[in-house]
């Protein structure tokens, strides 16, 4: 980014606040709450308590305020996903890339979510988490196994991350900032 772009971004940040609302979904133990903590504080804890229902957290990065709905991934909470995904700036779907047995279930739940008419066109960010583990899938394997090439009704992006080792968390934040909107 050149000096002119930096100056322009600084001027924008003085006059325009950006905001976004996103829903963080995925199966239990995928690392959704760990991702919220990594984005908010850069911190990581091995002793994470499973989310019951949902948690909401606001995080400010630069001039962007991100309202994050962290939704429980247990089967009994998955019916809530659609309700909390309506009208958001983006849907972030987190997958444990090292738990290969859970990928078919993740694919099924993701496909079910994407068929909801109320969610048409909302950008989708897929995050393959836990790439610090040797058994983690590659990005291409995850894209293939989730069938992401067939999703054509919305923007789809996929990053492989590690909340534990802070791998690609900055890229996720950059993607989120680019998908925020000016507050009116």
From Swiss-Prot:
Residues 1-18 dip into the membrane without crossing it. The keyword Cell cycle applies. InterPro entries: Arl8a/8b (IPR044154), P-loop_NTPase (IPR027417), Small_GTP-bd (IPR005225), Small_GTPase_ARF/SAR (IPR006689). SMART domains: ARF, RAB, RAS, SAR. GO terms for biological process: cell division; chromosome segregation; defense response to virus; protein transport. Coiled coil: none annotated. It holds the Pfam family Arf. One of its GO terms (cellular component) is lysosomal membrane. Disruption phenotype: In the triple mutants arl8a-1 arl8b-1 arl8c-1, impaired multiplication of tomato mosaic virus (ToMV). Keywords: Cell cycle, Cell division, Chromosome partition, Cytoplasm, Cytoskeleton, Endosome, GTP-binding, Lysosome, Membrane, Mitosis, Nucleotide-binding. Transmembrane segments: none annotated. May play a role in lysosome motility. May play a role in chromosome segregation. (Microbial infection) Component of tomato mosaic virus (ToMV) RNA replication complexes. Required for tobamovirus multiplication, especially for efficient negative-strand RNA synthesis and viral RNA capping. Belongs to the small GTPase superfamily. Arf family. NCBIfam families: small_GTP. Interacts with tubulin. This is ADP-ribosylation factor-like protein 8c. The gene is ARL8C.
